[in-house]
Design a protein with these regions (language model features):
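Membrane-interface anchor segments at the N-terminal boundary of transmembrane helices
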Residues: 108, 317-404
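Loop-to-helix entry region of an early transmembrane alpha helix in multi-pass inner-membrane enzymes
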Residues: 86, 90-98, 102-122, 154, ...
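Multi-pass, polyprenyl lipid-linked donor-dependent membrane glycosyltransferases
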Residues: 57, 87, 109-116, 140-170, ...
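Membrane-proximal stem/loop segments at transmembrane-domain junctions that anchor or position
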Residues: 248-348
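Extracytosolic helix-loop segments that constitute the early lumenal/periplasmic catalytic or substrate-binding loops
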Residues: 60-84, 91-92, 264-281
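Transmembrane-helix signature of polytopic, membrane-embedded enzymes
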Residues: 108, 121-149, 165-166, 181, ...
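Membrane-interface transmembrane helices that cradle and orient dolichyl/undecaprenyl
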Residues: 130-132, 169-185, 211-215, 440-443
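Membrane-interface alpha helices of multi-pass inner-membrane proteins
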Residues: 97, 142, 146, 174, ...
């Protein structure tokens, strides 16, 4: 009976306990959420006007690939990319190509990022309202979301996460309308999300689960699958025409797997394995002759070989990969240092602690304050989210939320199989915030009911 109440919506306890009914309390929260949104928008406009797009690592490579494509009059991927190490960020790179062709730079991505942030926010509020009704949870969610500095700094980043999230959360919200045609659009959005970042399949599976909880009609399932399948075929077909391969999505799986499953792996992104003497080493001749597909297969083969020989070591790395993925929220805050590499990593945090404790001659900067604030908000949110999941399961009220819990677990599970990194939890951050908002409201409701008694 316990497990049925967790997974079967009809057997689960109702979710109507989360509305306090207090008009004054609700009005205050509504005002706070409006203030939080206005403050976030103000900061974002400031970033938009005063900061250029910061590039490093993946974003630098996206820019280079887009620039090269524009010079050669092609889209991505093309025949120019057949011998690349991997194909990745397909959707974003093509957007950057469009931006360069229309405006001469990639600065327009900042407007796209702001649009995506509010698309994510609106989608999540809609999801909350469909599950819990017109409760205060939506306002708590808005306050926490807008108070998280990640959504300020990411405005000036050229990365895949925001576009992916806008499509993925938009697709999920559309599924909850209960209409057949929106399921078709949802399928298209899931496919576009996966085109941008290969995590869309986790959200798609959760979407199908969501339809199950809603007791959807067969037509809704068919429209969802049809929308996704047609979009995949169209994008893959265009890529095949351009480069001779059905390159619909990123092929970074083998590369990332080898980083997390090789001699010397520590759960983080370490590139020594690709150097001379490493399991992933390829000579210049091999690199120039092998296609991205062949390289991906080679990396996967080497990783699987190591896993078979060292299963215990591979499993031992999984908790660290999860920790590395969840511990930091500074990956977007390099914007405020005008350095995409700042705001993250052990060396940065050691320096920050030194400035905080006075052990360093350097004083805290405004960017440091933003990092400290964002990290504090995130850590509290993460703890509240974990407690919320336990609370919902123990109280047998998790059934309607299991698709979202699955999404979070699935995204973290992927990093545990491959390689960890703080950025990798960004796509599920709104669900973490949502869980924290649910717990805060449940505590407020319980407290109010006790006062009434």
């Amino acid at each position: 009976m316990f497990f049925r109440q967790i997974f079967d919506v009809r057997a689960a306890e109702p979710l109507n306990i989360f509305s306090s009914g207090g008009r004054k309390y609700k009005s205050v929260l509504k005002i706070l959420s409006i203030i939080a949104m206005a403050a976030m928008l103000g900061i974002q406009i400031y970033v938009l006007l005063t900061h250029k797009v910061v590039l490093a690592s993946d974003s630098q490579r996206y820019f280079e690939l887009a620039t090269n494509a524009v010079k050669n009059g092609v889209w991505y991927p093309s025949s120019l990319n057949i011998h690349d190490t991997y194909i990745f960020g397909n959707g974003l790179i093509n957007l950057l190509i469009l931006s360069i062709r229309l405006t001469g730079s990639i600065e327009a991505i900042k407007f796209v990022n702001i649009f995506c942030i509010y698309a994510i926010l609106i989608s999540c509020i809609y999801i909350i309202r469909k599950i819990f009704g017109d409760t205060e949870i939506q306002y708590w969610f808005t306050v926490i979301f807008c108070s998280t500095g990640t959504f300020w700094g990411e405005v000036a980043q050229a990365r895949t996460e925001l576009i992916f999230m806008a499509f993925a959360f938009g697709a999920t919200a559309l599924l909850m309308t209960g209409k057949i045609y929106t399921c078709l659009i949802s399928g298209i959005f899931f496919a576009l999300a996966n085109w941008t970042r290969p995590l869309g399949v986790v959200f798609l599976i959760a979407g199908i689960w969501l339809l199950v909880t809603q007791r959807a009609k067969l037509k809704q399932y068919l429209c969802l699958v049809l929308g996704a399948a047609v979009t995949v075929c169209v994008i893959g077909g265009i890529a095949y025409f351009n480069c001779g391969y059905f390159a619909y999505q990123a092929t970074t799986g083998g590369y990332n797997l080898l980083m997390g499953a090789s001699e010397g792996a520590d759960g983080t992104s370490k590139f020594e394995v690709f150097g001379e003497g490493g399991a992933g080493y390829l000579s210049e001749k091999q690199k120039s002759e092998m296609t991205f597909k062949e390289k991906d297969a080679f990396y996967k083969s080497e990783a699987m070989k190591w896993i078979k020989e060292n299963p215990g070591d591979y499993i031992k790395l999984m908790p660290k990969k999860m920790l590395v993925t969840l511990y930091s929220e500074g990956y977007s805050l390099g914007t405020f240092y005008n350095d995409a590499t700042a705001g993250n990593g052990g060396a940065f945090y050691r320096g920050l602690i030194g400035r905080m404790t006075g052990q360093s001659e350097e004083k805290l900067s405004s960017a440091d304050i933003i990092v400290i604030w964002t990290q504090a908000v995130y850590m509290v949110t993460l703890v509240l989210a974990f407690v919320c999941v336990v609370f919902l399961i123990v109280k047998r009220r998790a059934a309607k939320l299991m698709p979202f819990i699955f999404t979070v677990a699935g995204a973290i599970g992927v990093t545990m199989l491959l390689v960890g990194g703080p950025r990798y939890h960004f796509p599920i951050l709104p669900y973490i915030i949502m869980a924290a908002a649910i717990l805060i409201q449940s505590v407020a409701t319980i407290k109010e009911h006790k006062n009434e008694a």
